[in-house]
Amino acid sequence: LNKFFGLYLNEMTKLSRKIITIILLAVMIISVIGIGILFKVELEYYNSNDYNTMNSSDMSMLEERKKAYEIELDGIKSQIEGIENGENEDEVSKFKLYNQLINIEGEITYLDYAIENNLNIYTNLWIDSVMRNYSYAAAEIKYFEKVNEGYEKEEYEATVKEVKASSEKDLKVLNKYKEDKAAALNLYLDYQDAEIKSNKDISKEMAEIQLESNELKRQYNQNGEISTYLNNSIEKLKSNKISLLNNQSDENDRPLTHDEREELINKIAVQEHYIKSGAYLTQSKNDDSGVSSQIISIFISFSGFFVSILMIILAGSTISSEVSTGSIKSLIISPLKRHKIYTAKILSLTTFALFSLIIMYITIIITNQALFSEYTITPYIGAVNGKAYELNFYLHTFLLVLIKGIDVFVFMMFAMMLSTVTRNTSASVGISIAGFFGGLIISSSQMLYFISKGEWRKFIPFANLYLEDKFFPYSSLTEEMSGYYDNVGQITSLNFSLIYIAVLLVCMVYTGYESFIKRDIK
């Protein structure tokens, strides 16, 4: 045992003295700090701008759009005038032209209001929809009689009355917005609540979901504005609850399977916890964009890349380089058996990989604290059986690093197996790095999900690596809560992937042992 431990320490010494080790670990640390600084600069620039108002460039763009619409409007009016003067009696064309006229006049009124009140229409302001509804309703009322000449008088008057009532409500909200933005948002939500309650075509359960959604918006009304992320989250929560109520997939209108229902229940629990716990509403700036989860994900991706490359190079040369230099013979003639020599090399590489991951974790935490301490550190929120739970930010980050270590270990063992079988450093390192980059490309592009629907995809190694999203399916506050993240690329379950990786590692380790023990070393 003492001799084995001595061999293990000797292997550790060899690894630590390699110049590539120092270089790649240094590059990893520098890259994390550099990426952090760039992200910090971008955030500071973002926070220095008021995206609810327009700058001079935006204003000029809107004015140019308005002029273009006015020119188009004049052309349409000329065509309508020609039809009404008897130059063209095509009533179908006249009907289409009046509808175009409504749309263009509505757009001009909409742009006028935005320019007059300096509102940025390119942001997701709730007031934007009110502005647009009012503008188009005003144009519709103006030309309603021309477009709907075939209507019965009572039906016509009822429709006009309904449109005017809606337009008057929108106008009240717009006028209130100039005086008190928070009060305007509450008034807007009150009108929506009244419409929901008076709608006899929806069920009581559906109405409750919609009313609850409005109540959340009212609760998180910050001076008349709701953050984009929060608003999207509330809308996504409402959409998921409606899907669950109707037992229907939101994507393709098919009935939900049992597993999909369970997943949807957990998603709803996570979304409600994020919103109702106030994760979006703290005193830290820009906290609603999930800065902590975004930057940690970026840090782990970049640093994990360098750790993987480092371990591939070290493992890919651990046997082949010693065979080529002849230094392996001094180990072979020692009293230790070959399987113990190979085991010592695996343990030394594994220890060094863990050491690199610890450096990676420390670097990430220190950089995050140094550059982003003013931003909210949100815990990971998960759910089991419809009940949400929290996981400490630092523990969650540590677990993410360890999960990244699974990928590192798989590629490390692959490189070591090739080094043992081929006894060629260039081949083992080159093939392993090519496989590593191929896996990154395939996983990031979700290629396996889209190229085929066959079961064979489950048995491709790349479909079972990169397990962060399988261990923590709600790891990104921004993406999950905004509805942009939907686990699209997951074609295997966590349990299947873990079993697959275990079998794969056993095969690679066995192949390496067999090759090292039974082949002659010249």
Language model feature labels by segment:
Residues 18, 421, 499-522:
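Junction motif at the cytosolic side of a transmembrane helix
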Residues 28-32, 349, 433-437, 505:
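Residue-level recognition of pore/gate-forming positions within transmembrane alpha-helices
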Residues 315-332:
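Transmembrane helix boundary and interhelical loop/hinge segments in multi-pass membrane proteins
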Residues 311-315, 328, 363, 414, ...:
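Hydrophobic/aromatic residues in alpha-helical transmembrane segments
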Residues 37-41, 425-470:
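Transmembrane helix segments
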Residues 1-28, 343:
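Aromatic- and glycine-rich beta-strand/loop motifs that create alpha-glucan
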Residues 30-93, 100, 104-107, 111, ...:
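Secretory targeting signals
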